[in-house]
Amino acid sequence: MARTQAEPPASQPDARAAWLRDQLERANYAYYVLDQPDLPDAEYDRLFGELQQLEADHPELVTPDSPTQRVGGAVASGFTPVVHDAPMLSLNNGFSDDDIVAFDKRVADALDKPTDLAGSVTDPVEYACELKFDGLAISLRYERGVFVQASTRGDGTTGEDVTENVRTIRSIPLKLKGAHVPALLDVRGEVLMFKRDFARLNERQRAAEQREFANPRNAAAGSLRQLDPKITAQRPLSFFSYGIGVLDGMPMPDTHSALLDWYEALGLPVNRERAVVRGAQGLLEFFRKVGERRESLPYDIDGVVYKVNRRDEQDRLGFVSRAPRFALAHKFPAQEALTKLVAIDVQVGRTGAITPVARLEPVFVGGATVTNATLHNEDEVRRKDIRIGDTVIVRRAGDVIPEVVGALLERRPVDAAEFVMPTECPVCGSKIERLPDEAIARCTGGLFCPAQRKQALWHFAQRRALDIDGLGEKIIDQLVELNLVRTPADLFNLGFATLAELDRFAEKSAQNLLDSLEKAKHTTLARFIYGLGIRHVGESTAKDLAKHFGSLDPIMDASIEELLEVNDVGPIVAESIHQFFAEEHNRTVIDQLRAPGKVTWPEGPPAPKAPQGVLAGKTVVLTGTLPTLTRDAAKEMLEAAGAKVAGSVSKKTDYVVAGAEAGSKLAKAEELGIPVLDEDGLHQLLEGNTQ
């Protein structure tokens, strides 16, 4: 790589520092991205040392994008949450050729691709194909070309700030190349560790008599989440860009492949193992070629990713739940091994799900030693005919979650014992129930069971339930682990002294939480019902129950037949409600919550059988941001007037209320000829003016 820029003299420290930064970043790019080093190590070290000394003599010359800032900052006490500007969505998975053909057909149908008389698509969809790296997804934020923040994926909405650690990854530019860079760019990609670097790291670990890492993914994830950036700086991490979150100040590239080409021009690392293909056959051919080369690749992958290439077609396809409709991860077959099943226990999940777990003789599979594996549910154990004492096939599904695939019947010992599902929860002793047409058995002691305690408390405190501000997951973890809170009722017994002693919980925070708990004592019946966390009872069903019965006792004592009379309550929901209130442990907690000085709400008469209100029977959709009303406030006003508030626009929609930045729902309403109202129109509608 040519270095034609004139070298400023030492007498010009400002220009000299800028020149040194440029030389070092060019060398980093050639070495870590292009894999074509053009500067001897000794010369790199000399230039780096000169820049360090220059910045020490002139601290005002230190810039955030200086290569010297990669060595690691101060030790952090924890990671700060970061709310992503655009969600970091997961991908739906495909495993077989049939899955890929079905995916292509869904996409082609949704895009109205033309077909011939035989039903074959005559203009196949164009896809961008990439590798699916086995690492850790992160988001990089650049402002006017300068790297300012990095965050992990987290739950897709909120991640953790790992800026100082990511700053140490040499392949990530601290400043984008080129004179024309966007005002804001949110780059999505994967932090990973190459196989050779992983081997060298473990050699160092052995030499230092420290624990070795099981696989490159664990090493990468552990390195990125070090509290001390200096440790991360010593770990050989790499990065590949593959997506985008937010772009401001420049037009979005027309295709995904063009986006990746643009990233390369900006100096961002982009993997070269990619292609643009057409139709299902093109996808499968790419998958097979990559599969043949998988073991020879310098890094671990667990599949490939397909994305509809054209941006306008991606926008048309949109998203479903937490995944895009225009993309799919095609996973490789998982790795398998044989071992002996020595016992079957059951574990209770945070939502009460009872899962049989296989206890295994240790076996190394998929890069890790496995001693436990999921059996999913009772039906799966029966279907696979798995017994205690069997020699079983263990697979790391998706190379992460171990599962028992089946038993080798020819090796079955004569004393192999069948699994028997317990009838009582092994944690709390409550009855285990399994609803009709459901595969999962569940503990019915939702408010009482210690295994479900944290989930029950979090749900009870959330905004749409009791709305206990300040009671986050970390505080709940402490309260439960210190045995200060066993049920939601215990929350209202907490005192200032107890809260003030919690880790990282100042006196002001303690008082704020006490104030929030006091406020939460005055709620509504619907919020209280929703806060109980009854399976299948969401916010809407809780409102229907409160409206139908008027008070809590009739709900607790209602028969399944009486529950079925409630709007939108079917047999499964009715059975779930009935089972919840039939469990004495739950009733005990509810009585504690209703004790004097605890939670209260206005009682009301049962609702009339027919819906009342000026908007009875009408369906309304809200979209965008209204000038003065929050989405929740508008929804409550509409429901109070008898309307049903839906989440999507269809031919059954009567009105759409649109505010600022209304998106596809507004366009769909205009396409279908559905009346569109602003906030003033909403108020007129609520007053009975439906014209």
Curated annotation (Swiss-Prot):
NAD(+) binds at D41, A42, E43, Y44, D45, S90, L91, E130, R153, E190, K307, K331. Keywords: DNA damage, DNA repair, DNA replication, Ligase, Magnesium, Manganese, Metal-binding, NAD, Zinc. Residues 610-691 form the BRCT domain. The lineage of its organism: Bacteria, Pseudomonadati, Pseudomonadota, Betaproteobacteria, Burkholderiales. GO terms for molecular function: DNA binding; DNA ligase (NAD+) activity; metal ion binding. It catalyses: NAD(+) + (deoxyribonucleotide)n-3'-hydroxyl + 5'-phospho-(deoxyribonucleotide)m = (deoxyribonucleotide)n+m + AMP + beta-nicotinamide D-nucleotide. Pfam families: BRCT (PF00533), DNA_ligase_aden (PF01653), DNA_ligase_OB (PF03120), DNA_ligase_ZBD (PF03119), HHH_2 (PF12826), HHH_5 (PF14520), Nlig-Ia (PF22745). It comes from Burkholderia vietnamiensis (strain G4 / LMG 22486) (Burkholderia cepacia (strain R1808)). The keyword ATP-binding does not apply. SMART domains: BRCT, HhH1, LIGANc. GO terms for biological process: DNA repair; DNA replication. The active site is at K132. GO terms for cellular component: cytosol. DNA ligase that catalyzes the formation of phosphodiester linkages between 5'-phosphoryl and 3'-hydroxyl groups in double-stranded DNA using NAD as a coenzyme and as the energy source for the reaction. It is essential for DNA replication and repair of damaged DNA. Its EC number is 6.5.1.2. HAMAP family: DNA_ligase_A (MF_01588). It is an enzyme of class 6 (ligase). Belongs to the NAD-dependent DNA ligase family. LigA subfamily. NCBIfam families: dnlj, PRK07956.1. The gene is ligA. This is DNA ligase. Its cofactor is Mg(2+); Mn(2+). Zn(2+) binds at C425, C428, C443, C449.
